[in-house]
Amino acid sequence: MNIIYSTVNSLRDRYTPASHTSTFRNTGEITPEEFVAAGDYLVFKFPSWTWSDAETPAKRVAHLPPEKQYLVTRNVPCHRRLNDDFAGDAGHEEAVVEGGKNSGDDGWLRTGGLASSQPLKARDVRTVDDAGNVADRGAIDDEDDIPDMEEEEDDEAIIQDGSHGKHSGSRTYSLYITYSPWYKTPRMYMLGYQPNGQALIPHLMMEDIVGDYKDKTVTLEDFPFFATSVKTASIHPCKHAPVMKTLLDRADAALKLRKERQKAGLEVGSNQGLEGLEAQVVKLAVSGTGTDVANDANDEWEEVQHDAADQDVAIRVDQYLFIASVTPGIEHDFTMGV
C-alpha cells in the first residue's frame, strides 16, 4: 500500500502545474518563487544549508531554477534512537496542546516529556558487603575506600563492543527540502548513514521517528532528484500549510497586541508566548541589524513583498522556515551567519 501511495504521490508532484499566485497570508501555501526566496533566506542565515541541482537534467523541475532545485544540509548528528529510554518518558505519553482560551484554532501534538505524570524520584544509594548484608540508609563510605576507576585497568581478555546494543550508536543524516506543487508547501526528506559512512537500511531510519508518525506522517520514498532509486524517510506536507496558517495568524495577533500596548504606553513583555515569538522573528532581518526589514528601504528582500500592509505582519514569506518536530533525536544546526 505504501508503494502505491508513494508512486501516486511522486506522479502528482511531478506533473501538477505549479501555481504562481501567492496565497501565503490566506492559506499558508507558497509559490515556487516564494520557496526560492525562503530558501535564499535559510541559506543566508544558516550556512549549513545550501542549494543544489538535480543529479541529471532529466530530474529537474521546470518551476525552479536549475541551480536551486532543492535545499540540503549534510552530516547532521543523531546520537540516540527513539527507544523507551529517550528523553525520559518520551513515547509513553502524549498530549494535545490546545489553542488559546476561547480560540477555535486546532492544537498540536506534544509527545513525551510529561514529567507531571511520571515524576523523577531520587533513589537511595545503598551498599552490600561481602557477606551480602545491606547497609543502613544514610551510611556513607569513606571516600578513601571508594576505588578509583582511573586506576582500574581493562582486562585484555574482554572484547570491547562499540555498538553498545541494537538501538545505539551515532548516526548522521542528510536533510533535503524540496517544493511540492501538489501541496504548495516545502517537503522534507531524510537520508541516514551509519558511523562508517554507509547508508542506513531504509527501515532503520524509522528508529529516529516518533512512533505515532511512522508510516503515517513519515513514509519511505525515493528522493525525486537523484538519478537512481534511493529510499529516504519523507515527511508528508499535507498538514504543513494549515499549521503555518495558524502560526501566522497567532503571530500577527501578537504583533497587533504588541503595537496596541506600545501605543498606549504600556510595558511590553520581551518573551511572552507568541508575542515573544513575534519579537524574535522580527529580529531575523537579512541585514542582521535586528530591525524590522519591512521598514528598511534598502532591504534586499523588497522584491518579495511590496505592500505597505507588510508592516502589520509578524512573519514575512521569506521567513517561512521549515519546522520539523517528528525527529527530536536529530540535532539540527541552528548556527546563524553574521
Swiss-Prot record:
It is found in: Cytoplasm. It comes from Chaetomium globosum (strain ATCC 6205 / CBS 148.51 / DSM 1962 / NBRC 6347 / NRRL 1970) (Soil fungus). This is Autophagy-related protein 3. GO terms for cellular component: cytosol; mitochondrion; phagophore; phagophore assembly site. GO terms for biological process: autophagosome assembly; autophagy of mitochondrion; glycophagy; piecemeal microautophagy of the nucleus; protein targeting to membrane; protein transport. Residues 141-158 have a biased composition (Acidic residues). Keywords: Autophagy, Cytoplasm, Protein transport, Transport, Ubl conjugation pathway. Its main location: cytoplasm. Residues 242-319 are annotated as: Handle region. GO terms for molecular function: Atg8-family ligase activity. The active site is at residue 238. PANTHER family: UBIQUITIN-LIKE-CONJUGATING ENZYME ATG3 (PTHR12866:SF2). E2 conjugating enzyme required for the cytoplasm to vacuole transport (Cvt) and autophagy. Required for selective autophagic degradation of the nucleus (nucleophagy) as well as for mitophagy which contributes to regulate mitochondrial quantity and quality by eliminating the mitochondria to a basal level to fulfill cellular energy requirements and preventing excess ROS production. Responsible for the E2-like covalent binding of phosphatidylethanolamine to the C-terminal Gly of ATG8. InterPro entries: Atg3/Atg10. The gene is ATG3. Monomer. Interacts with ATG8 through an intermediate thioester bond through the C-terminal Gly of ATG8. Also interacts with the 40 amino acid C-terminal region of the E1-like ATG7 enzyme. Also interacts with the ATG12-ATG5 conjugate. Residues 135-170 are annotated as: Disordered.
